[in-house]
Amino acid sequence: MHMLLFIGALALPVFVCTQSCEPASLSPRLAGVDLEKFRLTPNAEYVDSDQQIPISTTNVGLIEQSYVETAIKLVRETFPNATFRLREDHYVGDNGVAHVHFRQTVHNLDVDNGDFNVNVGRDGSVFSYGNSFYTGPVPSITQLTKRDFTDPVAALKFALTHLQLPITAEDVSVESTKHPHKYVLRGTSGAVTNPKARLVYFVKPDGTLCLVWRVETDVDDNWLLTYVDAKTAEEIHGVVDYVSEATFQVYGWGINDPGQVDSRAVLTDPWDLKESPLTWFRDGQKNWTTTRGNNGIAQENINNLPTYLNNFRPDSPTQNFSYEYPAGGSPKDYINASITQLFYTANAYHDLLYTLGFNEKAGNFQWNNSGLGGKEKDYVILNAQDGASRNNADFATPPDGSPARMRMYLFTHTTPPRDGVFESGIVIHEYTHGLSMRLTGGPDNSRCLSAFESASMGEGWGDFMATAIRLKPSDTRATDYGMGMWVYNNEKGIRQYLYSTSMETNPLNYTSLNRMWEAHAGGTVWASMLYEVLWNLIDRHGKNDGPRPTFDERGVPKDGKYLAMKIVIDAMALQPCNPDFVQARNAILDADQALTGGQNKCEIWTGFAKRGLGQGAEYGRGRRVGSYDIPGDVCQKKI
């Protein structure tokens, strides 16, 4: 049986609103509460591949036992007095670099923001590493032995009250789990799932260590980890939000929005069996005849229901998903076309990311991993025309093994409203949140893009990937792009500036961050830097306008566009938890070193230096010092 997709040439749109398409705080839908003040404070360091790493290793190649032992040895030599545990999400990327992750412990409890990631090269030696381990005095175990801390219900109630969460908890019961300090809190109402609480240590913004309850609450709009002081249950030390606010007849891959073409296209079996061996409709157990499969499940959620399995989705016994999309029609009239478009774009992006290295081992989103590593049963829940909000889109990324959730909304800047799923850049931007959160810090840790600069880069990566995908054959480095232009009916889009290599059109640079406090604004700075790097690489290597990259014998994309995307993705897995701009830049340089032997240092340094992130650029709490210098031995050039 063949599947027909009516896909319009809606090239992947350039825009995707993560937390909020309009300027917004960390969690815009928490009325009266600004979660920005609870963002985690970055405390990571990153030792890149250019620095000498003093550890002796046996170069036996990447055998699992050997690369894990090498990583353990590095952690022990770096922090000889620290205790820690090896996480289970280590893997070898398709660039040949192994990624091993550790969590610091104190008195057998996790230090929840104490992370150490080790990257081991093809030869078995340490390539680079990052860490945010706590190095101060360890608190006495007395607080634990005497149980001098509050119960988890008190912590939950304080979080609900202080953050004004729409959950009632008047008659809560505590259920123990296999973990001695982890509990399920039953008897609440208003949450998608039962809240959870876990006793952990937490490094506070002032650098001290304290015992906290990590309270997990999912209310759709916000999926929070709230760190409540365990002694008093009257203070919140930090908050992480998993939600980032972004035959088929469809707008095809590379078509950004309906404004670019007159009609949609009909596609037959558009998947690639190397990337989706079960196709888009099978999950290893059943061959579905609706918009459901191994990579995602798409449905309408007009009434903002908390569940999704029984929501409406089109069904075709012949897998012929061709539906009308009338120009100027009411959104409800084309709900079948909307769901089909969302299912298509998400699956197509899954397949592209797979070939660029975001596979099962790396923590991608699939129900069935076919024994290829990683945790299963975590496809993406795709809600079209979700009734929870307007003029927005969002993506929730829990750790590997739990389904992600994308909610696409209607945009009311036109009459009738426009459906965000038809601007594929929004879908791409949102899905990229899942990519960057699963790779940064490892698949089992979704808390590593929670500081201001790291969250900003989370937004910037989404804009960058959406923009790179929508490039047209006629584009040059003089081509400018906006984000959200179609849904907002505005040629300038929703960002402060267009993405451009012209400093007159877009003057943003590294020190612009000193005047910014919101992640979407900061993300525009990061994406502007990546846009410079993108065109530098295209000018050197050319541009492949096809839907998939071609690789040389080393696994390196042969063109500049896909090479830029590949290096950016590889760097996410190298960088530390909650990186800053300087560390992320260094990780991109390291990614090129691992993939090509550093053949593109000049192009990368030149792109970053043009916008103030050159050699010598520095980050210090809230204050950045820019630099336009390029290392003298890289390309003998200074901006």
Curated annotation (Swiss-Prot):
* GO CC terms, sorted: extracellular region
Q: Which GO terms describe its biological process?
A: proteolysis
E.C. number(s) listed in UniProt = 3.4.24.-
Q: Where in the cell is it found?
A: Secreted
The cofactors it requires, by name, are: Zn(2+)
Tell me the superkingdom of the source: Eukaryota
What is the protein named? Answer: Extracellular metalloproteinase NpIII
Q: Which organism is it from?
A: Aspergillus oryzae (strain ATCC 42149 / RIB 40) (Yellow koji mold)
